[in-house]
From Swiss-Prot:
The keyword Cytoplasm applies. Pfam families: RBFA. Belongs to the RbfA family. GO terms for biological process: maturation of SSU-rRNA. Residues 123-147 are annotated as: Disordered. It comes from Corynebacterium aurimucosum (strain ATCC 700975 / DSM 44827 / CIP 107346 / CN-1) (Corynebacterium nigricans). GO terms for cellular component: cytosol. This is Ribosome-binding factor A. Keywords: Cytoplasm, Ribosome biogenesis. InterPro entries: KH_dom-like_a/b, RbfA, RbfA_dom_sf, Ribosome-bd_factorA_CS. Monomer. Binds 30S ribosomal subunits, but not 50S ribosomal subunits or 70S ribosomes. It is found in: Cytoplasm. One of several proteins that assist in the late maturation steps of the functional core of the 30S ribosomal subunit. Associates with free 30S ribosomal subunits (but not with 30S subunits that are part of 70S ribosomes or polysomes). Required for efficient processing of 16S rRNA. May interact with the 5'-terminal helix region of 16S rRNA.
Length: 147
């Protein structure tokens, strides 16, 4: 029987443990710009997926995703040992790391929304001085035409 609440608690705990281990215990310069964003554990509590993002060294520089992935792969065993020591469970889940694409997707959505707002403002500006193509009241009645 799957206990989703227990899996969620364990995932949150794994996220915290891995993030602090990368910050304090793992000595790899390639992991300095890695941020752990989320963790998910399967229902049987045997596999954990840890999601991460990578920042660039400067605002304008592109992050090195390949180096971060390689560093996480190399530190996977050490991180699993640390997670096993911190968790009080019979079986330590295996760790797999995935690049979190949510920040890039949300930035893209923000860009699309900003473009839509700019187009709406442009259309509103054009609409202010617009006149109807025909008469102002195209639905005249016959009584009005005789006057």
């Amino acid at each position: 029987m799957v206990d989703h609440a227990r899996a969620a608690r364990m995932a949150k705990r794994i996220q915290t443990i891995v993030a602090s281990a990368i910050e304090r215990q793992i000595k790899d310069r390639r992991l300095e710009l890695v941020t752990i964003t989320d963790a998910r554990v399967t229902g049987d509590l045997h596999d954990a997926t840890v999601f991460y993002t990578v920042r660039g060294t400067d605002i304008g520089t592109e992050p090195d995703y390949d180096q971060a992935a390689e560093a996480l792969t190399r530190a996977k065993g050490q991180l699993r040992k640390i997670v096993g020591d911190e968790l009080s469970v019979r079986f330590t889940p295996t760790l797999s790391f995935e690049l979190d694409t949510v920040p890039e997707a949300s930035a893209h959505m923000e860009e699309l929304l900003a473009r839509a707002r700019a187009r709406d403002a442009e259309l509103a500006k054009l609409k202010e001085g617009a006149q109807p193509a025909g008469d102002a009241n195209p639905y005249k009645t016959s009584d009005e035409e005789e006057d």
